[in-house]
């Protein structure tokens, strides 16, 4: 299987502020494979080192080292330390001769902007039929965020659900105060709090989940199948947020599901990947059958429409050759 690779860097349509900082652009690698019959496939490597994946430089080094002709045996040598590369090559290989995929729309969770902007943005998403929302916390002081959140919870209609994402920014004392506040003011609208504590505080995370009433989801703590299995073995009672583009070969998640991991505990989420990776993920969802609104409501920052023709893939690829 012959293959080529091209690096991309795209500015975000507007900066995305999280507890880890401000994102202004997104970089990655597009892959193009072609077999002896001339059938093509495409993949995307979109690492996010702040979320536990490798760096883009590590993926560039891999692409420079691999031979110009791929085989399954060669791809099997891609190390687990490069999960975004594993995903990109695996999905590219699987797509050869099968594009375009038929993909369906799934319910999407709308990501709201930080601060006061959330009080206006939810209405636009609600009018588009979205009923699940996500808001980043840990960006301002707890008092400022709780004042905004109280107004947001009062404004959200019946049936709306809200996810709070701390991106691991709280310490245990802050988390305790937040969960006590949510017990008083949550109005039954909080679906879960995502990654309240840093990933290295696993014992505190487990203790917290066992003592609070609001559900907790792990995100940065579970960037690989091995980490999900580790948390299952620890008795984790909450959700797992799966950033599929950073998770490695998709077969690793399929194996966990076959071993008994309950699909209703999984929430699939974007890593601000591009259209090639997003379309591959939505194709995989036909097998995984998600039970919750997808965390892909990020078009305000990076628009990545699903690719429905082979020409659409070719245009993306050729754009990087200009």
UniProtKB/Swiss-Prot annotation:
The active site is at 136 (proton donor), 243 (proton acceptor). Pfam families: MenC_N (PF21508), MR_MLE_C (PF13378). One of its GO terms (molecular function) is O-succinylbenzoate synthase activity. Its cofactor is a divalent metal cation. InterPro entries: Enolase-like_C_sf (IPR036849), Enolase-like_N (IPR029017), Enolase_C-like (IPR029065), Mandelate_racemase_C (IPR013342), OSB_synthase_MenC1 (IPR010196), OSBS_N (IPR041338). Its EC number is 4.2.1.113. Pathway: Quinol/quinone metabolism; 1,4-dihydroxy-2-naphthoate biosynthesis; 1,4-dihydroxy-2-naphthoate from chorismate: step 4/7; Cofactor biosynthesis; phylloquinone biosynthesis. Keywords: Lyase, Magnesium, Metal-binding. One of its GO terms (biological process) is phylloquinone biosynthetic process. It catalyses: (1R,6R)-6-hydroxy-2-succinyl-cyclohexa-2,4-diene-1-carboxylate = 2-succinylbenzoate + H2O. Mg(2+) binds at residues 165, 194, 219. The keyword Lyase applies. Belongs to the mandelate racemase/muconate lactonizing enzyme family. MenC type 1 subfamily. Converts 2-succinyl-6-hydroxy-2,4-cyclohexadiene-1-carboxylate (SHCHC) to 2-succinylbenzoate (OSB). Does not show N-succinylamino acid racemase (NSAR) activity with N-succinyl-L-phenylglycine as substrate. Monomer. This is o-succinylbenzoate synthase. It comes from Thermosynechococcus vestitus (strain NIES-2133 / IAM M-273 / BP-1). The lineage of its organism: Bacteria, Bacillati, Cyanobacteriota, Cyanophyceae, Acaryochloridales. The gene is menC.
């Amino acid at each position: 299987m012959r293959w080529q690779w091209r690096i991309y860097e795209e500015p975000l349509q507007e900066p995305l502020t999280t507890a880890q900082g401000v994102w202004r652009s997104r970089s990655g690698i597009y892959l193009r494979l072609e077999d002896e019959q001339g059938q093509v496939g495409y993949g995307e490597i979109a690492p996010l080192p702040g979320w536990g994946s490798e760096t883009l430089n590590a993926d560039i080094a891999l692409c420079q080292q691999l031979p110009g002709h791929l085989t399954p045996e060669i791809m099997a040598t891609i190390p687990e330390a490069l999960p975004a590369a594993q995903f990109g090559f695996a999905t590219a290989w699987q797509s050869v001769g099968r594009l375009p995929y038929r993909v369906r729309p799934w319910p999407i969770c709308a990501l709201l902007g930080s601060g006061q902007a959330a009080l206006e943005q939810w209405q636009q998403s609600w009018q588009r039929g979205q009923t699940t929302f996500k808001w980043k916390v840990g960006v301002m002081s707890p008092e400022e965020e709780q004042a905004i959140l109280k107004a947001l919870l009062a404004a959200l209609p019946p049936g709306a659900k809200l996810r709070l994402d701390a991106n691991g920014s709280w310490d245990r004392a802050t988390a305790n105060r937040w969960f006590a506040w949510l017990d008083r003011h949550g109005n039954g609208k909080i679906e879960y709090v995502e990654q309240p504590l840093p990933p290295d505080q696993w014992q505190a995370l487990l203790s917290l989940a066992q003592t609070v009433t609001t559900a907790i989801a792990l995100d940065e703590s579970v960037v690989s199948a091995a980490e999900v299995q580790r948390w299952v073995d620890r008795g984790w009672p909450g959700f797992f947020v799966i950033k599929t583009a950073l998770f490695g070969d998709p077969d690793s998640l399929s194996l966990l599901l076959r071993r008994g991991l309950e699909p209703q505990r999984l929430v699939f989420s974007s890593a601000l990947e591009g259209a090639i990776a997003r379309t591959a993920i939505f194709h995989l969802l036909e097998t995984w059958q998600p039970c919750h609104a997808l965390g892909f409501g990020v078009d305000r920052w990076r628009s990545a429409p699903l690719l429905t023709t082979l020409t659409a893939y070719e245009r993306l690829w050729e754009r990087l050759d200009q």
